[in-house]
């Protein structure tokens, strides 16, 4: 197989076709774009005025072992994303950066209501929710066409906010399902803000036969994952690091699998893993201690993601490199991650099948041929599951 040294080569990893399912639009800005948008908006509160220094500031602020502290930097990115022009630009650049990193399909999420404050320094009123959605979708549509990428937009509600607002955002997501909105999410601090409080929003989404992903098991235990699945009907779980608490482990071996952990395994519930981010927020103690490796050995359907490229100073290729370095992933494992993600995407079934064969398996096979590598070994976990 491909040697570990080669698999840690970012240039090689960028050539691998990848699929991203868990990234926040307001956490994926380019540092120089933040500076330019701040100048245009008259926003003078950025802590640094040099792109490299600003990037270091965001990373230093995020890498503090706490989700609330990790989220502090978002007030700056959100502040400069208050005009239609800014939103369209950020969305376009997001997919452009995906293309440069070898991503062939990406789902990006954001909370539209956070972008309705306007530009008080210029006396400009805030955008309406529809204007926010249209601006982001315009940027994604243009970039998808320019860079030949598949994409989908996910609307986020926030756990700490009024459930009535969550219902309004769910209705907004459904209203744009034909324009590229593919799913609904619940994000934010889990402790003290159970997903069940937002049940009306999820009941509405389920009645509309729409897709659901929920941040769960990041800063709270298995109960949060259980609520996301059994109360709210989540089709995917964001992060899921604390699912490990439903596994009994002795001397590195799993001796008992709890009913929740077994449910996710049996039902092939995708888990959106974010290695770097989970260490930065304290959801995992270190990269090597992240449960990703254990989940992989047990056969869970895993996808690999960045969460927030700016805050965690990462790319999806870098996350693949970390999976190789800290969890022993080989080229077959990396291909499985891409296939799992495309299987789990909120795109229509026929499109997922086409992209798995044409945009993932075919390029991987060509890379193997170019490097004189043997064909990919079959994986039992890739039995047809839809």
Model-derived features with residue positions:
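Metal-cofactor-binding active-site regions of metalloenzymes
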Residues: 1-210, 218-236, 242-386
């Amino acid at each position: 197989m491909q040697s570990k040294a080669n698999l840690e080569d970012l240039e090689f990893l960028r050539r691998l076709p990848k699929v991203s399912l868990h990234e926040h639009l307001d956490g994926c800005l380019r540092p120089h774009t933040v500076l330019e948008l701040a100048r245009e908006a008259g926003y003078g509160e950025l802590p640094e005025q040099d792109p490299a220094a600003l990037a270091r500031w965001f990373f230093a602020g995020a890498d503090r072992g706490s989700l609330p502290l990790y989220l502090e930097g978002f007030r700056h990115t959100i502040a400069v994303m208050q005009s239609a022009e800014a939103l369209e630009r950020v969305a376009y650049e997001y997919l452009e950066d995906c293309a440069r990193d070898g991503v062939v399909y990406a789902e990006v999420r954001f909370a539209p209501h956070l972008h309705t404050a306007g530009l008080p320094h210029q006396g400009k009123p805030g955008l309406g929710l529809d204007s926010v959605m249209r601006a982001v979708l315009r940027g994604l549509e243009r970039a998808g066409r320019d860079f030949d990428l598949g994409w989908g937009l996910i609307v986020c509600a926030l756990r700490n906010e009024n459930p009535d607002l969550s219902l309004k955002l769910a209705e907004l997501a459904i209203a744009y399902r034909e324009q590229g909105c593919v799913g609904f999410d619940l994000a934010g601090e889990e402790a003290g803000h159970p997903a069940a409080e937002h049940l009306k929003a999820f009941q509405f989404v389920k009645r509309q036969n729409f897709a659901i992903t929920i941040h769960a098991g990041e800063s709270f235990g298995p109960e949060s994952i259980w609520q996301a699945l059994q109360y709210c009907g989540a089709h995917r779980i964001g992060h899921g690091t604390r699912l490990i608490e439903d596994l009994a482990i002795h001397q590195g071996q799993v001796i008992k699998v709890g009913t929740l952990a077994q449910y996710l395994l049996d039902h092939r519930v995708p888990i959106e893993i974010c290695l770097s981010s989970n260490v930065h927020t304290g959801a995992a103690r270190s990269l090597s201690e992240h449960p990703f490796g254990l989940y992989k050995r047990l056969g869970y359907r895993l996808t690999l993601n960045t969460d927030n490229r700016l805050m965690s100073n990462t790319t999806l290729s870098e996350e693949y490199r970390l999976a190789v370095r800290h969890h022993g992933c080989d080229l077959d494992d990396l291909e499985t991650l891409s296939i799992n993600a495309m299987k789990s995407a909120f795109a229509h079934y026929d499109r997922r099948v086409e992209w798995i064969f044409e945009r993932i398996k075919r390029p991987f096979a060509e890379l193997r041929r170019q490097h004189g590598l043997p064909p990919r070994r079959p994986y039992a976990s890739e039995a047809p599951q839809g």
